[in-house]
C-alpha cells in the first residue's frame, strides 16, 4: 500500500491558503481525512467557516440518488447547509457568496464525466469568478487512475450535467486537475488554488493507496464498482435494463426479467473481451428499475483491470442485448437524471442515453458500439493532449 495524503491531510498547506479567510465549504460523502473525520468537520474546527453548501447527495452523503436535496441544518455543526443543487442552479448565488471570501471544494470524484460533481465544480468556479471570490480545491486521488482515457468525447455544443468541456467518458484526471483544465482551456478566470495530493502516481488505483474507501455516492461501494461505473453507467439511459441499482452489486449486475442470462453470458464470452468474464446470474432489485422482479442477466467480473476496457465492455454488452431483444429495448427520454444545465425544454439530445454517450448516432442506429468508439478516436487523442498541460502528477 502506498502512503498518500489528500489535500485535507496537509494542514500546513491549508493554513497558508485558508487562515484568516471566511470560508464557504462544498463537500460530500466519502470526503474524509486519514483519521476518518469528515472534511467539513476538519475545516469547521480549524478555520472560520461561514457557509456550508451541499450538492447532489448532501454535505455528508445522506441523500440517495435522484432525491431532492433541500437546504437543512447540519446536526454536527449546527450550521445551515444551503442547497446549490436544484432545478435552478448547481452553484452558489451571489448572495450566498457575499458571506465568504473563499470557497473550499473537497469532494470525491469517480473518474468519469457522468459523475455530476465535476460539473458542479466547474459551475462553482464560474460563480466565484463572477463574484470575485477565490476557490481552493483540496485534491484527492483519481479512484480509477489517471492514465486510461476511454469512450466518447463531448462536442463543443454540449453543456449538460453529465457531459461538458470536451471531456471523455473516462476522464483520467483528479478533481484538481479538472479544475485547472476548465480554468485554463475555457477561460473561466477563477482565482484558483489546488492543494495537490502527496504520494499518488497516475497509474495508481484507489485500493493501491492506504486511504479508506467511504462511499462517494450510494452506489459506488468500492474501486471495482467505480471501474465498472465508468462504462456501465450508460445503462442508466436504457429504461428497460437494470444496471444493478437496488442490489449489493450496482454496475456489476446487468439484466432484466426477459433476458436469458445463460445465452447473454455465452454471447459476451464469445466476444473475447480482455480482462473480464461474464457469469449468468439471477437478481431482484429492491429499488430502481424492475424493483421486486426477478431479473436474469450477467455478472460482470473484472479479472485484469489493466486490460479491462470499461466503456467498450459496456457498449458491446448493450449491443448484444439489443441484438438479442430488439423489441424490448426502450430508451430513457431527456427528462431522466437531474440535469439543470440542459433542461428538457432545450434539448441538444432527445434521449438520456444520447447525453451519456455525447452522441445520438448510437440510439438512432447509425453506428454500433465499435463504430461509436472508432468515431471518437481522434477526439480522444486530442482530449488526451489538451488535458496533459494541467496534470499535477506523474
Short names for language-model regions:
Residues 255-377:
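Conserved functional hotspot residues or short segments at active or partner-binding sites
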Residues 70-100, 112:
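Glycine-rich oxoanion-binding loops at beta->alpha junctions
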Residues 200-281, 285-288:
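Glycine-rich, aromatic-lined ligand/substrate-binding cores of catalytic
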Residues 2-48:
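N-terminal phosphate-binding or glycine-rich loops at protein starts, especially the Walker A/P-loop
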Residues 62-65, 136-158:
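Glycine-rich, charge-decorated loop segments at or immediately adjacent to ligand/cofactor-binding or catalytic sites
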Amino acid at each position: 500500500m502506498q502512503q498518500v495524503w489528500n489535500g485535507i491531510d496537509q494542514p500546513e498547506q491549508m493554513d497558508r491558503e485558508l487562515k484568516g479567510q471566511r470560508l464557504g465549504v462544498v463537500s460530500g460523502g466519502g470526503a474524509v481525512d486519514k483519521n476518518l473525520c469528515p472534511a467539513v468537520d476538519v475545516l469547521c474546527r480549524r478555520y472560520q467557516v461561514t457557509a456550508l453548501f451541499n450538492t447532489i447527495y448532501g454535505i455528508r452523503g445522506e441523500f440517495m440518488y435522484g432525491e431532492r436535496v433541500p437546504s437543512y441544518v447540519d446536526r454536527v455543526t449546527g450550521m445551515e447547509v444551503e442547497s446549490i443543487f436544484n432545478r435552478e442552479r448547481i452553484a452558489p448565488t451571489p448572495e450566498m457568496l457575499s458571506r465568504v471570501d473563499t470557497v473550499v471544494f473537497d469532494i470525491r470524484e469517480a473518474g468519469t464525466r457522468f459523475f455530476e460533481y465535476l460539473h458542479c465544480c466547474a459551475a462553482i468556479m464560474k460563480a466565484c469568478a463572477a463574484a470575485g471570490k477565490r476557490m481552493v480545491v483540496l485534491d484527492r486521488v483519481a479512484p480509477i487512475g489517471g492514465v486510461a482515457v476511454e469512450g466518447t468525447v463531448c462536442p463543443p455544443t454540449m453543456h449538460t450535467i453529465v457531459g461538458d468541456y470536451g471531456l471523455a467518458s473516462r476522464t483520467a484526471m483528479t478533481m484538481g486537475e479538472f479544475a485547472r483544465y476548465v480554468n485554463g482551456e475555457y477561460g473561466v478566470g477563477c482565482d484558483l488554488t489546488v492543494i495537490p495530493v502527496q504520494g499518488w502516481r497516475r497509474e495508481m488505483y484507489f485500493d493501491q493507496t492506504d486511504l479508506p474507501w467511504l462511499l462517494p455516492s450510494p452506489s459506488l461501494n468500492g474501486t471495482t464498482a467505480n471501474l465498472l461505473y465508468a462504462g456501465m453507467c450508460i445503462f442508466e439511459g436504457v429504461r428497460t435494463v437494470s444496471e444493478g441499482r437496488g442490489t449489493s452489486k450496482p454496475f456489476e449486475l446487468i439484466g432484466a426479467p426477459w433476458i436469458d442470462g445463460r445465452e447473454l453470458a455465452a454471447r459476451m464470452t464469445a466476444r473475447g473481451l480482455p480482462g473480464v468474464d461474464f457469469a449468468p446470474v439471477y437478481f431482484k432489485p429492491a429499488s430502481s428499475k424492475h424493483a421486486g422482479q426477478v431479473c436474469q442477466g450477467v455478472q460482470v467480473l473484472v479479472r485484469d483491470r489493466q486490460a479491462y476496457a470499461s466503456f467498450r465492455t459496456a457498449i458491446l454488452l448493450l449491443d448484444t442485448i439489443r441484438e438479442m431483444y430488439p423489441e424490448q429495448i426502450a430508451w430513457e427520454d431527456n427528462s431522466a437524471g437531474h440535469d439543470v444545465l440542459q433542461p428538457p425544454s432545450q434539448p441538444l439530445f432527445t434521449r438520456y442515453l444520447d447525453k451519456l454517450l455525447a452522441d445520438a448516432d448510437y440510439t438512432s442506429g447509425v453506428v454500433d458500439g465499435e463504430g461509436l468508439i472508432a468515431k471518437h478516436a481522434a477526439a480522444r487523442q486530442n482530449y488526451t493532449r489538451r488535458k496533459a498541460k494541467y496534470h499535477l502528477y506523474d
